[in-house]
Amino acid sequence: MNIFKNFEKKIKKSIELSDIKGKNGEDLDLSKITVDPPRDSSHGHLSTNAAMVLAKSIGLSPRALADKIIELLKNDISIENIDVAGPGFINIKLTKLFWQDAVKYMLELGLSYGRIPMGQGKRINVEYVSANPTGPMHVGHCRGAVVGDVLSNLLQFAGYNITKEYYINDAGQQIEVLAHSVLLRYREALGQKINEIPEGLYPGEYLIPLGQALAQEFGDQLLTMDRDEALSIVKERAIHTMMSMIREDLAALNIYHDIFFSERMLYADNARAIRNTINDLTLNGYIYKGKLPPPKGQNIEDWEPSEQTLFRSTNVGDDQDRVLIKSDGSYTYFAADVAYFRDKFNRHFDEMIYILGADHAGYVKRLEAMAKAISGNKAKLSVFLCQLVKLFRNGQPVRMSKRAGSFVTLRDVVEEVGRDPVRFMMLYRKCEAPLDFDFAKVTEQSKDNPIFYVQYANARCHSVFRQAQEVLHIESFSNDILITYLHRLIDDNEILLIRKLSEYPRIIEQAVVHKEPHRLAFYLYDLASCFHTHWNKGSENLNLRFIQPHDKELSFARLGLIQAVINILSSGLSIIGVEAPIEMR
């Protein structure tokens, strides 16, 4: 139950059934009416802009129209007080009975509270991570991995049928470089002295065990056999080993994809998938032979003046046409990307989501263009770019050097601070904004550490039930007992906490609509803060403590409120993919 949406519908219905019409008696456009929490909680529980957005079309001042709308709503039994504020906002205060019933509804639904059936089984493909299989995942991959995984969980929670996909870039030049790098480590394992890793090869020590494994399996056979045959063997072993490493890295973050799609599949059978894609585009007038002008402000060495096979992507919104087949007959990386999108589209997803690194910003237009061309403008596509993660330790930057092969791996971070802090903190900024990750901050036990603060709220809630068992001499508390006495929840602090709990379905809906999982992390922190504030007031005022030894009914009512907090914290943390601990020491 999204109380904000419910009241929005109620206000719209009241206006539709009233004599409030446009200047010429026409029906009004009510689509811009919203109901939200007021910015200042002292102004009421709900606030609507109805009078502000309709006044001009009616020919009244917003305040005058607000008075008319108030007349329509004032007899609603759930409303305690309704008035107009400022230029014409309508503020609504709801009855205590309404909020007590809201807790009852939360307890009846349990962990399903907030689960709005928005998706209705629609199929969405979410592609995320898709790191090159050339080494272990580093911290730069971490943010997109978490954002993609939590967004997938969020969409599933809202009723969508989600496919989590990883595209393995295993057919490009980087795989050639990987194979030569592994061969170097193989020779090293056989006893050859390698003074320095040549420029352009991967210098990381993570390839040493693979070189040793090849030496153990093949001895020196790879040195004597045909070089292409040897490279083919090394490629297969290297890709398999790197992908196993990547899967283990992702598993450390509790991330598991449904599909791992190999780029090499697109090149199978003489690149049939790519050829078919280009044939389709040709039939629709998107392919021509031509020359592209030299790129402005870029390295002219990468420009080819010869005639090539081009995709007329400017016809579908791109800023320049794209090469699909070079003059030597080889396919570009982009040709494989287009074929991959065609494969996805032919799997009949209702929407395709790409989670990419910020370095792919220039790729978005061509991705949108290929989607329009392949689908005839029918594909629904969403692209999200994740900005960089900067590592700190006690406020000091952590230095890394790609050239030297020294970088902080995803596994390093998870092993040092734990999975939960990594997952939660990667969401604690909008993905479009850079994120600072401080190893010290994410492990400290304070309000300044969001994941600790949220999990501690859940643990505190469970401690209240343990205390209740001892003080009230009751082994377990059924929903029926907790619901029976909710009418005792009348304190303003309790109502404030209920109001925050009631925002959960709205937050879920907004996070799904905008595809912004960080909204959920922010909300859980705010809910935890609201709970901790209420807890602390019990230290100052014994009457506000959750357990009242001489008043079982009030204790049961407050335990019902605590159970609602537990349910929503557990639900939200489950979507984010972190634990909801019942005890913390």
UniProtKB/Swiss-Prot annotation:
A motif ('HIGH' region) lies at residues 131-141. It holds the Pfam family tRNA-synt_1d. GO terms for molecular function: arginine-tRNA ligase activity; ATP binding. One of its GO terms (biological process) is arginyl-tRNA aminoacylation. It is an enzyme of class 6 (ligase). It catalyses: tRNA(Arg) + L-arginine + ATP = L-arginyl-tRNA(Arg) + AMP + diphosphate. It is found in: Cytoplasm. The keyword Glycoprotein does not apply. GO terms for cellular component: cytoplasm. Its EC number is 6.1.1.19. Keywords: Aminoacyl-tRNA synthetase, ATP-binding, Cytoplasm, Ligase, Nucleotide-binding, Protein biosynthesis. Gene3D superfamilies: Arginyl tRNA synthetase N-terminal domain, HUPs, Isoleucyl-tRNA Synthetase, Domain 1. The keyword Aminoacyl-tRNA synthetase applies. Disulfide bonds: none annotated. SMART domains: Arg_tRNA_synt_N, DALR_1. Belongs to the class-I aminoacyl-tRNA synthetase family. PANTHER family: ARGININE--TRNA LIGASE, CYTOPLASMIC, ARGINYL-TRNA SYNTHETASE. Monomer. This is Arginine--tRNA ligase. It comes from Bartonella tribocorum (strain CIP 105476 / IBS 506). The gene is argS.
